[in-house]
Amino acid sequence: MKAVKAPVEEMDQAECEVKEEKSASGPCFPPTFSVSEIKNKQRRHTMFLKLKEEKRKKRMELKKKKKKERKALDDKAPPKEVPKTIENQRIYDETTVNPEDEEVAFDEGTDEFSAYFNRLTNPKVLITTSDRPRGRTVRFCDQLATVIPHAYVYYRRGLALKKVIPQCISRGFTYLMVINEDRKVPNGMVLCHLPDGPTAHFKVSSVRLRKEMKRRGKNPTEHSPEVILNNFTTRLGHSIGRLFAALFPHDPQFVGRQVATFHNQRDFIFFRFHRYIFKNEKKVGIQELGPRFTLKLRSLQKGTFDSKFGEYEWVHKRHEMDSSRRKFHL
């Protein structure tokens, strides 16, 4: 009996040691454990915060360690790593425009906007809406007319766009802008360059009118604004940039200190309207005037608007084109 008891006592001691180790180190989870497997909501939330704090501490320790190593090496320290972003990891597009390319210069001299850039025409814009627009869409159109010089707001009254376009051409308009709405909110824009096109269709989102903006400036003056176009690098983006540029007069009136910005980032075009505030000879600030909104290109059509027989240069096909987050078209 004594020979049998010895191994049993050793096993009991081993089990006690294991239990003590477990209690000291906290609960042990299997290697494939996930916080989402905890059914109790309060415990799950507590465990999530605990894991998040542990990750933060490890990250800070690693950061301090790297900082000490860099300080010790001084001039011999390796160069800092550039953070990876979707922009600098972008997949190269073969249609990226080189401004010095002769083919690009020839296309610019013969495309639909050449008359504007050769100063043969002055922009004149007609802004209209879908049928029976609501108050928010009407106010949005009125504010757009204060941003774009020589812009006039007219209401459709049930007329088809195919009948509106010939009337615009006969009255000397160079652009037709149609603001569509859904559930009383502006959600689309059709921008048609006259008389030869092209026609672009955009999705409109994140519309903020002037009254909805904090710390906005006074209403814009009638001075022609400066136009800034950012990150329109491909052939398609170049065409869209020229489409926006031709909305505004050739020579900005810098006395008004107003600037309209179309900033392309990940194929979203952010529009902002600012006024420069000069504090002294060296310092300058900007004051947003509004409105602000975001555009997403849906299609680009050759010629004027024709929903049935129009020839499309580019159409956004979401499931085919958005397979990679690092692929951009503008």
UniProtKB/Swiss-Prot annotation:
Superkingdom: Eukaryota
Q: Which region ranges are annotated with the description RNA-binding?
A: 284-301
List keywords of the entry alphabetically: Nucleus, Ribosome biogenesis, RNA-binding, rRNA processing, rRNA-binding
Its Gene Ontology molecular function terms? RNA binding; rRNA primary transcript binding
Record's compositionally biased regions (Basic and acidic residues): 71-83
What are the Brix domain coordinates in residue numbering? 123-306
Which protein are we looking at?
Answer: Ribosome production factor 1
